[in-house]
Amino acid sequence: MSFTTISVIGLGYIGLPTAAAFASRQKHVIGVDVNQHAVDTINRGEIHIVEPDLGAVVKTAVENGFLRATTTPVDADAYLIAVPTPFKGEHEPDMVYVEAAAKSLAPVLKKGALVILESTSPVGATEQMATWLAEMRPDLTFPQQVGEHADVNIAYCPERVLPGQVMVELIKNDRVIGGMTSVCSARASELYNIFLEGECVVTNARTAEMCKLTENSFRDVNIAFANELSLICADQGINVWELIRLANRHPRVNILQPGPGVGGHCIAVDPWFIVAQNPQQAKLIRTAREVNDGKPHWVVDRVKAAVADCLAD
């Protein structure tokens, strides 16, 4: 089944560029978002987020009739869910937006459709999404029920783009494709190859989910090492910048530069998804989060102390 109409649910900093990328390849794309202002803005050929080069692509796509936005899902050949996945309580992942998105598209699902979850999610989220869909559509079959013969194909395909470079990295970067079956993976790869110049690397859904969490946890741990060094060096009266410069002269050492914590949204959130599911095993990942979460407070305390010394003088 070819992909004539593609629906992207969630028109934020990942969803809208993804919708625009498909539309730029002359696919009919329907973006869905609960934010009426975002929908109205997009339908005027404008954008409600800041991202270089995105505005021109959206404007052209809307003017040529390949992109429109709505607040309610409609019939499509493929659905991509790109909604927020924050954490709640004691840093447990909150899947309420994914659940709402899945249940909103369930009534318009048809045989042969492909549903892809792009939102950063805990391991097992794709299977849970498939369960929600199956509960609402008992007239259709799903991969967890009949495997490769399912009426609806489901996959997890996380984004890995840098804000400010999204329109380049969305197309150039390799993509991890985690289908619930090999058929699901093949169809998801076919979909992304509409605009992708990078490689589709195929695995299963659970590994793909863990891959995205691992990428950001790896970065978080490395940042935490540099930040912890800065705390130690401050206590020991050592210049941390000189220390790192010297240590990095070792051919197999590449320590990052310390800072006031971590930037962006993902790195400060995603590692907690691993910790929440594996509290006994993820001790290093938890500690890295605690180090980086505490660094801004340490910086503030240092600034206060410096200001106090100046005022005292």
Predicted regions and their residues:
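Structural/interface elements that position substrates and couple domains in central-metabolism enzymes
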Residues: M1-D313
